[in-house]
């Protein structure tokens, strides 16, 4: 009909089904065309009018939608969908209290209060009235124990209100009425961890697994808890079970890698970190832990290779750029150190360590002017750091500003905080400073 422009007569329900089919498949132009034909044949059909408001809302035409909803309310004042859609408009305009008032009206006419209670709870979340939100999510759960989104929202409210014990009491009562609810046991275990009650947490995760042996989240949380108590072998077993229940994912491979690293199994740890990266190339922490492991094994050239690869997919990772500066400094690739430090500088996220890498690289490259300028900037961020001040002094002397350099050295010596390590480093850079008996 829509392709040939041949108009056939359908009843309102048939048009509704056609329109919903197109909406569900994202074919909004066809949905609008079918709606137009349907409205021509059934101009006062409430369900078609409501579908029109839904499409108007999707397109952001709030005023037109609101106008149509007022018209529908006159025709069918007992229709809950009118109040729900009007509430949606106010919610999108961030007028959440007006949205709540309309949803209260919807409660008086609905045959499905659970859905409306959930919407009211979410509106209260928007205005951070967690006590009221909590009340409505509890209502949802009283009506439907499997409304897990309401359960998660309720626990979020308890958390924001710092009511961990109250959350624990609620979950225990919830479990009393539904003892094989794996989600509730899982959440109770997570609460026990926050309360440092690890034995009770372990039992809760075990009960979650007993309730549903294919519930992978319980194995994952149990694995994390076993890591926390240094039982890495058992943690690996639980992670491996979760692997079998779901498709492989980077998070689990990374956790198994960490366990092997703690057990001293460097090769296995590297294998799992690499597997994690293959599954999710931008999994930053897997790159970092793999690079750290290579550094600890003194495989610096290999770690540099991995840093380069990691930055190809995680180019905005400040931690990986810091790693790049550190590793390239160790292997004396000073130009690459400067590149890394320049990026770190561009986003204003320097540490004392990276400032020193940058200044020292410029010194090794004998670029005294740049080393001097960078050192001055670093000294503004760390004004009491003798190591930086002495680097600046040495650069000034190399640039022919001997008096300024000598003055900085004298002032720094007065502070009496020059360690043997600093003294050794500065004398290696600037042998002429030996005369000052730093």
Residue ranges of model-derived segments:
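Start-of-helix register in tetratricopeptide repeats
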Residues: 13, 47, 81, 115, ...
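Structural marker of alpha-solenoid helical repeat scaffolds
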Residues: 41, 74-76, 109-110, 143-144, ...
């Amino acid at each position: 009909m829509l392709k040939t422009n041949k108009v056939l007569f359908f009843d309102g329900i048939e048009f509704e089904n056609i329109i919903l089919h197109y909406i569900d498949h994202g074919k909004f132009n066809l949905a609008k065309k079918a709606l137009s034909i349907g409205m021509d044949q059934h101009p006062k059909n409430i369900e078609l009018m409501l579908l029109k408001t839904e499409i108007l809302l999707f397109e952001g035409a709030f005023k037109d939608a609101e106008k149509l909803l007022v018209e529908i309310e006159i025709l069918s004042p007992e229709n809950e969908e009118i109040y729900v859609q009007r509430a949606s408009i106010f919610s999108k305009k961030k007028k959440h209290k007006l949205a709540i008032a309309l949803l209260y009206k919807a409660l008086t006419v609905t045959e499905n209060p659970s859905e409306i209670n959930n919407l009211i709870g979410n509106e209260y979340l928007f205005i951070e009235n967690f006590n009221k939100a909590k009340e409505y999510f509890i209502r949802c759960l009283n009506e439907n124990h499997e409304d897990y989104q309401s359960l998660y929202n309720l626990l979020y409210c308890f958390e924001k209100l710092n009511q961990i014990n109250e959350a624990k009491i609620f979950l225990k009562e919830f479990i009393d009425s539904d003892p094989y609810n794996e989600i509730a046991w899982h959440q109770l275990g997570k609460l026990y961890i926050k309360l440092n009650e690890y034995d009770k947490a372990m039992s809760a995760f075990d009960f979650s697994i007993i309730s549903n042996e294919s519930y992978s989240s319980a194995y994952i949380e149990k694995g994390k808890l076993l890591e926390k108590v240094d039982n890495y072998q058992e943690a690996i077993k639980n992670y491996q079970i979760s692997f079998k229940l779901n498709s492989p994912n980077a998070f689990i491979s990374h956790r198994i890698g960490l366990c092997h690293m703690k057990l001293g199994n460097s090769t296995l740890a590297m294998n799992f970190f690499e597997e994690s990266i293959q599954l999710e190339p931008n999994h930053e922490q897997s790159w970092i832990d793999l690079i750290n492991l290579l550094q600890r094994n003194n495989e610096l050239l290999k770690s540099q290779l991995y840093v380069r690869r990691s930055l190809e997919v995680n180019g905005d990772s400040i931690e990986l750029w810091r790693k790049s500066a550190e590793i390239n400094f160790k292997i004396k690739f000073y130009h690459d150190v400067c590149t890394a430090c320049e990026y770190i500088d561009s986003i204003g996220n320097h540490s004392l360590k990276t400032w020193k890498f940058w200044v020292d690289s410029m010194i090794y490259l004998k670029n005294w002017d740049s080393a001097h300028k960078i050192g001055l900037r670093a000294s503004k961020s760390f004004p009491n750091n003798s190591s930086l001040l002495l680097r600046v002094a040495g650069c000034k002397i190399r640039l022919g500003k001997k008096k300024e350099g000598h003055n900085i050295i004298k002032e720094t010596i007065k502070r009496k905080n020059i360690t043997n390590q600093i003294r050794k480093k500065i004398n290696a850079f600037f042998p002429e400073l030996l005369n000052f008996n730093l």
